[in-house]
């Protein structure tokens, strides 16, 4: 380690070496490359990546915390002015907390006493001292005034949004302090670092503004509610929404037949969390999901599973929201519950784009729908979520009174990976139908049959769910040429209403049509329409 009084600089053809103060704690498997200057009292946990390999220095101020999985990178061009009036790619002030999986990408400035929540991103932005950025937020191309609060899921990309952010409250600081905790680290400079994984906890960098303990410490530490659930509840309440819950046993969960729990009338955070705890206890051994409810429009703005029968909860709530308001309680145009797109469609589009797929649409009038003669809509070239959702809204408006289905497209293989009906002229598309329509997932074999002919759990579960809702099962086949033009050939509907009868019949179809595409069809016999399409075999 270099002398504490000097900072190494890059020589010809060689990156500068990081400077780490002897009083800093850096985990042995953290990755620190380039001209990174880490001050005294800084704690860098396992899996942190700090890479200053583009020629400009990074500064991490005293007593800051970087939790597991945090990433700090920079660009070759673009600088920020640090508190010492020098140019940096990334400046992180004193007592800053950067939590798990957060990304700070330079040029970026974080003032003293800032907090950045799980999986949030700060890029090309200045964040004023004392600001709190909650979970899964994006802050880009803006300057946030000191002491502002960025709610979970917010997308702050215009200065107008940044200027309207609310001020941080004492309970926000207390919650941030509670989340930071005291993660153990391994000090590189300690000879026994590789053997000793324990360190003495030190005070957290963010102090509560009130001596009174808050709801967070009472519930997150001892109850069933995770910190992400508590954060989401607080965010929803701050935006004026009500909190609700639903529960389902394993049988009802498979068919998405949720039952409402006792309504939560209170808007007091402490009382709401207490009632949520009671709900989880009352329905132990069942699935429970959290709801955010807009009482003005009488619609849901958020859904997330918060309990499973085995007592576990999802690692992250990030992929489950129905629609999350961003900024100062305002919803983005594409996620608005008053728009044409349902919450589940918005979520599915987000997931498909995250996997690198393109989005497409097809439409059909009632006559063409009966013969599955879909017509392609104008292609959506963008991969930006906001633009894609806006174009989907336009497509639904343009083809009002027709059937419209959403497509997920793998541009590399020029094949579809997802199909779902998102507009039905005869009424709203139910959540079960939207959820039951995937063609395939990111793993091509996840919705196929195994080599010995037995069905995968995904396909068997799909069949079970459709039969449980009273739907009939059919199949369609296509060779490679017909598949490219979506010219499927229908097979006779499968007789039988039991899983034991239908699954063997499907296996026979797959054997008979080896070397062809085969897709499963769920049919509503009462309405004489399709409710699900699922690709179960590829050549």
UniProtKB/Swiss-Prot annotation:
Disulfide bond positions: 261-279, 377-395
Residue ranges, compositional bias (Low complexity): 431-457
Region (Disordered): 194-213, 427-459
One of the Pfam families matching this protein, by short name: RuBisCO_small
UniProt entry keywords in alphabetical sequence: Bacterial microcompartment, Carbon dioxide fixation, Carboxysome, Disulfide bond, Photosynthesis, Repeat
RbcS-like repeat 1, SSUL repeats: 226-397
Transmembrane segments: none
UniProt RbcS-like repeat 2, SSUL repeat ranges: 341-425
Practical applications according to UniProt: Heterologous expression of 12 carboxysomal genes in E.coli (ccaA, ccmK2, ccmK3, ccmK4, ccmL, ccmM, ccmN, ccmO, ccmP, rbcL, rbcS, rbcX) leads to the formation of bodies that resemble carboxysomes, have densely packed paracrystalline arrays and RuBisCO activity. These structures open the door to generating carboxysomes in plant cells to increase their photosynthesis and productivity, as well as tailoring bacterial microcompartments to specific metabolic needs and molecule delivery.
Annotated RbcS-like repeat 3, SSUL repeat ranges: 453-539
Induction: Carboxysome size and components vary with growth conditions. When grown in ambient air at medium light (50 uE meter(-2) second(-1)) there are 719 units (both forms are included in this measure) of this protein per carboxysome, the numbers decrease under low light and high CO(2), and increase under high light (at protein level).
Main location: other
Record's GO cellular component terms: carboxysome
GO function terms (MF aspect): structural constituent of carboxysome shell
Annotated stretches, region: Carbonic anhydrase-like domain: 1-214
Protein location: Carboxysome
Phenotype reported upon loss of the gene: Single gene deletion does not form normal carboxysomes, and does not grow in normal air but in 2% CO(2), called a high-CO(2) requiring phenotype, HCR. CcmK2 and RuBisCO are targeted to an abnormal large polar body in some studies, RuBisCO is soluble in others. When ccmL-ccmM-ccmN-ccmO are deleted no carboxysomes form, cells are HCR and RuBisCO is soluble.
Biological process annotations from GO: carbon fixation; photosynthesis
Note from the entry: The M35 form (short form) is translated from the internal start codon Val-216 (gtg), under control of an internal Shine-Dalgarno sequence. Silent mutation of the codon for Val-216 to a non-start codon (i.e. gtg to gtc) leads to low level expression of the M35 form, and abnormal carboxysomes which contain the expected proteins, but does not grow in normal air.
Role played: Functions as a scaffold protein for the assembly of beta-carboxysomes, initiates carboxysome assembly by coalescing RuBisCO (ribulose bisphosphate carboxylase, rbcL-rbcS). Produced as a full-length (M58) and a shorter form (M35); both forms are required for correct carboxysome assembly and growth. The short form is more abundant. Despite its strong similarity to gamma-class carbonic anhydrase (CA) it does not have detectable CA activity.
Membership in a protein family: Belongs to the gamma-class carbonic anhydrase family.
Domain description: In the N-terminus has a gamma-class carbonic anhydrase-like domain (CA), while the C-terminus has 3 repeats that are similar to the small subunit of RuBisCO (rbcS), called SSUL. The SSUL are connected by flexible linkers. The N-terminal domain forms a scaffold on which CA and maybe other carboxysomal proteins assemble, while the C-terminus binds RuBisCO. At least 2 SSUL domains are required for initiation of carboxysome assembly. Isolated reduced and oxidized CcmM35 binds holo-RuBisCO (RbcL(8)-RbcS(8)) but neither subunit octamer alone; RuBisCO has a higher affinity for reduced M35.
Protein name: Carboxysome assembly protein CcmM
């Amino acid at each position: 380690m270099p002398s504490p009084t000097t900072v190494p600089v890059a020589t010809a053809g060689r990156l500068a070496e990081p400077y780490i103060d002897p009083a800093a704690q850096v985990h042995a498997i953290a990755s620190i490359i380039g001209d990174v200057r880490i001050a005294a009292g800084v704690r860098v946990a396992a899996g942190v990546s700090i890479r200053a390999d583009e020629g400009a220095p990074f500064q991490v101020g005293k007593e800051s915390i970087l939790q597991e999985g945090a990433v700090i990178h920079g660009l070759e061009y673009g600088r920020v002015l640090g508190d010492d009036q020098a140019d940096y790619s990334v400046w992180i002030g004193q007592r800053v907390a950067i939590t798990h999986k957060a990304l700070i990408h330079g040029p970026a400035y974080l003032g003293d006493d800032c907090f950045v929540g799980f999986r949030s991103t700060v890029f090309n932005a200045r964040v004023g001292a004392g600001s709190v950025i909650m979970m899964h937020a994006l802050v880009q191309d803006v300057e946030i005034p000191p002491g502002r609060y960025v709610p979970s899921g917010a997308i702050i990309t215009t200065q107008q949004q940044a200027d309207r952010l609310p001020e941080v409250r004492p309970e926000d600081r207390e919650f941030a302090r509670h989340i930071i905790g005291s993660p153990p680290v391994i000090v590189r400079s300690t000879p026994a670092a590789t053997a000793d994984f324990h360190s003495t906890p030190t005070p957290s960098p963010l102090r509560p503004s009130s001596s009174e303990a808050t709801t967070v410490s009472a519930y997150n530490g001892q109850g069933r509610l995770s910190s992400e659930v508590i954060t989401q509840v607080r965010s929803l309440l701050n935006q004026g929404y009500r909190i609700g819950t639903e529960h389902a046993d394993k049988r009802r969960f498979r068919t998405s037949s949720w039952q409402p729990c006792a309504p939560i009338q209170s808007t007091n955070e402490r009382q709401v969390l207490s009632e949520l705890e009671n709900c989880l206890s009352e329905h132990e051994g069942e699935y429970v999901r959290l709801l955010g409810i807009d009482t003005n429009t009488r619609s849901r703005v958020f859904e997330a599973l918060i309990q499973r029968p085995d007592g576990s909860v999802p690692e992250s709530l990030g992929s489950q929201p129905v629609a999350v308001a961003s900024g100062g309680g305002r919803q983005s145009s594409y996620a608005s519950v008053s728009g044409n797109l349902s919450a589940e469609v918005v979520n599915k589009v987000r997931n498909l784009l995250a996997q690198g797929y393109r989005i497409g649409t097809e439409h059909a009038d009632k006559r063409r729908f009966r013969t599955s003669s879909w017509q392609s809509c104008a292609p959506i070239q963008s991969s930006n979520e906001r633009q894609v959702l806006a174009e989907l809204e336009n497509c639904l408006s343009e083809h009002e009174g027709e059937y419209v289905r959403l497509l997920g497209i793998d541009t590399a293989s020029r094949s579809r990976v997802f199909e779902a009906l998102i507009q039905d002229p005869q009424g709203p598309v139910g959540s079960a139908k939207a959820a039951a329509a995937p063609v395939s997932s990111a793993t091509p074999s996840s919705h196929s049959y195994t080599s010995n002919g037995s069905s995968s759990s995904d396909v068997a579960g799909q069949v079970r769910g459709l039969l449980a809702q009273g739907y009939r099962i059919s199949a369609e086949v296509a060779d490679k040429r017909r598949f490219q033009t979506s010219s499927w050939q229908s097979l006779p509907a499968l007789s039988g209403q039991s899983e034991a009868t239908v699954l063997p019949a499907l296996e026979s179809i797959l054997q008979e049509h080896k070397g062809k595409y085969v897709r499963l069809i769920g049919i509503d016999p009462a309405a004489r329409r399709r409710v699900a399409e699922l690709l179960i075999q590829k050549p």
